[in-house]
Amino acid sequence: MSLAGSRLLFSLVFLVGALASWAAFNLQTGGGLESCSLWSVQRLLLLALGGVNLLAVIQGPGRVGRAVYWGLNLLLGLLGVVTAGRHVLLQNIPSEQLLACLPDMSFMLRQLSWWQALKLTFMGTSDCAEVTWTLLDMSLPEWSLLFFVIMLIFSGYRLWRQLRGARKAVALP
């Protein structure tokens, strides 16, 4: 794929990620949605995905660089699927079976190890079990899961194409 074509794809992923981040931010601030810690992690992953793709657009990487960027997109997509999937799972568990509350993420990161804070975050709270907003009968974590699944599939496909093209380039004398 040409450099211009790869920049276009990275630009597209950046724009979609930026739009999703903007929508999530506006829903929380303008819509008055309370954020649980898992939703904060999902937003952080969205921002990281956007940042990686913006760097790829600015750099205009070669063949190896494109493979690295698609690999990073794949990793972020996988982390997003795990996080959003856990959030969707928590929404299907009665809130009485979950922790009542947790301190905010910044407090947990100051007082606990990174691993302990992540573990507590993934345990979830009753806040994470609440469905406060839906669009087309899908909650925000379900939309997030759909977005990350699409990113995972797209990034996996692009990485596979990149690696397959690299193998062909090496095989040719």
Swiss-Prot record:
<dbReference type="InterPro" id="IPR022920">
    <property type="entry name" value="Disulphide_bond_form_DsbB"/>
</dbReference>
<feature type="topological domain" description="Cytoplasmic">
    <location>
        <begin position="62"/>
        <end position="67"/>
    </location>
</feature>
<feature type="disulfide bond" description="Redox-active">
    <location>
        <begin position="101"/>
        <end position="128"/>
    </location>
</feature>
<feature type="transmembrane region" description="Helical">
    <location>
        <begin position="10"/>
        <end position="26"/>
    </location>
</feature>
<keyword id="KW-0997">Cell inner membrane</keyword>
<keyword id="KW-0813">Transport</keyword>
<dbReference type="InterPro" id="IPR050183">
    <property type="entry name" value="DsbB"/>
</dbReference>
<dbReference type="GO" id="GO:0005886">
    <property type="term" value="C:plasma membrane"/>
</dbReference>
<keyword id="KW-1015">Disulfide bond</keyword>
<dbReference type="InterPro" id="IPR003752">
    <property type="entry name" value="DiS_bond_form_DsbB/BdbC"/>
</dbReference>
<feature type="topological domain" description="Cytoplasmic">
    <location>
        <begin position="162"/>
        <end position="173"/>
    </location>
</feature>
<comment type="similarity">
    <text>Belongs to the DsbB family.</text>
</comment>
<feature type="transmembrane region" description="Helical">
    <location>
        <begin position="143"/>
        <end position="161"/>
    </location>
</feature>
<dbReference type="GO" id="GO:0006457">
    <property type="term" value="P:protein folding"/>
</dbReference>
<feature type="topological domain" description="Cytoplasmic">
    <location>
        <begin position="1"/>
        <end position="9"/>
    </location>
</feature>
<feature type="transmembrane region" description="Helical">
    <location>
        <begin position="45"/>
        <end position="61"/>
    </location>
</feature>
<dbReference type="Pfam" id="PF02600">
    <property type="entry name" value="DsbB"/>
</dbReference>
<keyword id="KW-0143">Chaperone</keyword>
<dbReference type="GO" id="GO:0015035">
    <property type="term" value="F:protein-disulfide reductase activity"/>
</dbReference>
<keyword id="KW-1003">Cell membrane</keyword>
<keyword id="KW-0676">Redox-active center</keyword>
<keyword id="KW-1133">Transmembrane helix</keyword>
<keyword id="KW-0560">Oxidoreductase</keyword>
<keyword id="KW-0812">Transmembrane</keyword>
<keyword id="KW-0249">Electron transport</keyword>
<comment type="function">
    <text>Required for disulfide bond formation in some periplasmic proteins. Acts by oxidizing the DsbA protein.</text>
</comment>
<feature type="topological domain" description="Periplasmic">
    <location>
        <begin position="27"/>
        <end position="44"/>
    </location>
</feature>
<feature type="transmembrane region" description="Helical">
    <location>
        <begin position="68"/>
        <end position="85"/>
    </location>
</feature>
<dbReference type="InterPro" id="IPR023380">
    <property type="entry name" value="DsbB-like_sf"/>
</dbReference>
<dbReference type="GO" id="GO:0009055">
    <property type="term" value="F:electron transfer activity"/>
</dbReference>
<keyword id="KW-0472">Membrane</keyword>
<protein>
    <recommendedName>
        <fullName>Disulfide bond formation protein B 2</fullName>
    </recommendedName>
</protein>
<feature type="topological domain" description="Periplasmic">
    <location>
        <begin position="86"/>
        <end position="142"/>
    </location>
</feature>
